[in-house]
Amino acid sequence: MNQGYTQLSAPELKETKTSKLNKMNNFRSSPIAEIINKIPPDCGKIQNTTFPEFNPALRRRQHEQWPAYEKPIRVTDSMSPQLSSINCLPNLYPHGTLPLPNPYLSYLNHIEKVNCQDVKFSNWSVLHNSNNGFEIPTYFSPRTTQNMPCSEKVESWLERLPIFVGFDGYLFTNCFDYEYMLDWEETEFTFEKTSCMETDYSKALTDTDIIYIQEKKIEALIRNQYLKEYEFSQKDF
């Protein structure tokens, strides 16, 4: 009797043989056996493989066909310590080579992405000067009125300015006091017009006066709104 079964009884030996036969039958009926049978016997030989990792001749021919800017370089000890440390990774880089990116191709890819921007803003920039041939686009208008001449803009501004002319020809600027309500301008102009208010004062104002009046108007509205805001204190908590 075989020495391997000296410790087994007859029922146990029969059960062991039956289990081995069942395993063999299951393996033969599985797709694994069919796949293994299709593998050629010389698959493990290096000279017949089609993978460059295991075929030096194929890997050398593939290296010669690469473009010059994509060919990997040999990492030597004369290079920086960061690059030479790659030689310590034989599993990742068995031949000490590292493909470097091409700066020119990276620049072309960047230009291609930039050109895919919105057409409305691709040809215009705040940094462009008047000598580069670009013109201000028609949609760029800080005012609601499109393509209004500068003279008409100034006259339109003057018509909406809350200016009050005194009897001695002085301009009253106390209308910009922050204690007025937000609708102080509408309230002032609801009164009956007098000869003093009907005076044509637009021609007597300079650009500096217009800017000053607009500045005071905006400042008064901001201060009025600031005083209306409620500030939290420690008593609220």
UniProtKB/Swiss-Prot annotation:
GO terms for cellular component: cytoplasm; nucleus; spindle pole body. It is found in: Nucleus; Cytoplasm, Cytoskeleton, Microtubule organizing center, Spindle pole body. GO terms for biological process: ascospore wall assembly. Keywords: Cytoplasm, Cytoskeleton, Nucleus, Sporulation. Involved in the pathway that organizes the shaping and sizing of the prospore membrane (PSM) during sporulation. Required to localize MPC54 to all four spindle pole bodies, and localize DON1 and SPO14 to four prospore membranes. This is Prospore formation at selected spindle poles protein 1. It comes from Saccharomyces cerevisiae (strain ATCC 204508 / S288c) (Baker's yeast). The lineage of its organism: Eukaryota, Fungi, Dikarya, Ascomycota, Saccharomycotina. The gene is PFS1.
